[in-house]
């Protein structure tokens, strides 16, 4: 069984506190985009086998797709195993939920193969044990995600909007970015309510104005290239630009495909991983 695993971007990301167990409390507006990996799963007698077209992708428990399959098989006492073939298009360690969406897609395919009676809500319970972005990736679309990612409120779909996406030539560790964030020193928070209102009113310029990611407090200081990319997007006609997730991917929001194409061509001269895509 073959399925697409779509990436996401953050239209906003706020950190509003930290729990005693070390988990950060988040308030994020998440958006699925039409950039995707392909996941194919076949039933086998025993075990979990992962194959991928990129050699650097781990094929053991370090891969969230493996972890998803293992949790599913254990939870439902399934005796057989699975072979998972992954075709990677989403950049890794990029803030685009590449690993999380693969894991979510594995859960959904395995449900179809083994337990079609399972609801999305039940799948999300498993998903939360894998990572904060995985529950959102079960549903996709446009949603407000709160807590540690488990509280998901769908909002009006912000679909068919044009994005140009740049993944710089380095990766970032989500854990390191959050560890270096000082919550008490976040002085400007996203106006998430205003952002949602702007989406509901189809006010693209207001959406662009209200996009904000507090993790940029960490990454923009350390990686000057991210500032340059954001500035380049605005110079090349983007309505707004923001880092997605814990980075380092940066996207520009456009209202014109010609401007987006010119921007893409310009960015492609400097960076290997550049994409034109749309929200879905």
Swiss-Prot record:
Q: Name one GO biological process term.
A: isopentenyl diphosphate biosynthetic process, methylerythritol 4-phosphate pathway
Q: Which Pfam families match?
A: GHMP_kinases_C (PF08544), GHMP_kinases_N (PF00288)
Sequence positions that bind ATP: 91-101
Give the reaction(s) catalysed. 4-CDP-2-C-methyl-D-erythritol + ATP = 4-CDP-2-C-methyl-D-erythritol 2-phosphate + ADP + H(+)
Q: Does the keyword Lyase apply?
A: no
Q: Which domain of life is it from?
A: Bacteria
Please verify whether the record's keywords include ATP-binding.
Answer: yes
Which Gene3D superfamilies does the UniProt record give? 3.30.230.10, GHMP kinase, C-terminal domain
Q: In which pathway does it act?
A: Isoprenoid biosynthesis; isopentenyl diphosphate biosynthesis via DXP pathway; isopentenyl diphosphate from 1-deoxy-D-xylulose 5-phosphate: step 3/6
* InterPro entries with a match to the protein in the record: GHMP_kinase_C_dom (IPR013750), GHMP_kinase_C_sf (IPR036554), GHMP_kinase_N_dom (IPR006204), IspE (IPR004424), Ribosomal_Su5_D2-typ_SF (IPR020568), Ribsml_uS5_D2-typ_fold_subgr (IPR014721)
| Enzyme nomenclature, EC number | 2.7.1.148
Alphabetically sorted, this entry's keywords are:
ATP-binding, Isoprene biosynthesis, Kinase, Nucleotide-binding, Transferase
Q: Which GO terms describe its molecular function?
A: 4-(cytidine 5'-diphospho)-2-C-methyl-D-erythritol kinase activity; ATP binding
Q: Where is the active site?
A: 8, 133
- Which family, according to UniProt? Belongs to the GHMP kinase family. IspE subfamily.
Its annotated function is as follows: Catalyzes the phosphorylation of the position 2 hydroxy group of 4-diphosphocytidyl-2C-methyl-D-erythritol.
Q: Which PANTHER family match?
A: 4-DIPHOSPHOCYTIDYL-2-C-METHYL-D-ERYTHRITOL KINASE, CHLOROPLASTIC (PTHR43527:SF2)
Put simply, this protein is called 4-diphosphocytidyl-2-C-methyl-D-erythritol kinase
């Amino acid at each position: 069984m073959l399925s697409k695993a779509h990436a996401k971007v953050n239209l906003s990301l706020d950190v509003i506190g930290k729990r005693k167990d070390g988990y950060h409390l988040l308030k994020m507006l998440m958006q699925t985009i039409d950039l995707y990996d392909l996941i194919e799963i076949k039933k086998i007698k025993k075990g979990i086998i992962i194959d991928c077209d990129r050699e650097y992708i781990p094929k053991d428990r370090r891969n969230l797709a493996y972890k998803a399959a293992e949790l599913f098989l254990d939870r439902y006492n399934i005796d057989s195993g699975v072979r998972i073939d992954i075709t990677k298009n989403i950049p890794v360690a990029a803030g685009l939920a590449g690993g999380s969406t693969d894991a979510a897609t594995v859960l959904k395919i395995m449900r179809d193969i083994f337990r079609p009676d399972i609801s999305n809500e039940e799948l999300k319970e498993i998903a939360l044990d894998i990572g904060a972005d995985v529950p959102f990736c079960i549903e996709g679309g446009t949603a407000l995600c709160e807590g540690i990612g488990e509280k998901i409120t769908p909002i009006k779909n912000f679909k068919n909007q044009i994005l140009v996406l740049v993944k710089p030539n380095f990766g970032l560790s989500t854990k390191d970015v959050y560890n270096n964030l000082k919550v008490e020193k976040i002085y400007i928070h996203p106006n998430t309510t205003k952002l949602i209102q702007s989406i509901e009113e189809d006010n693209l310029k207001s959406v662009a104005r209200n996009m904000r990611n507090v993790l940029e407090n960490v990454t923009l200081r350390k990686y000057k290239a991210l500032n340059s990319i954001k500035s380049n997007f605005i110079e090349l006609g983007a309505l707004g630009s923001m880092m997605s997730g814990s980075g380092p991917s940066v996207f520009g929001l456009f209202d014109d495909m010609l401007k987006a194409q010119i921007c893409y061509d310009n960015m492609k001269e400097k960076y290997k991983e550049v994409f034109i895509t749309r929200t879905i």
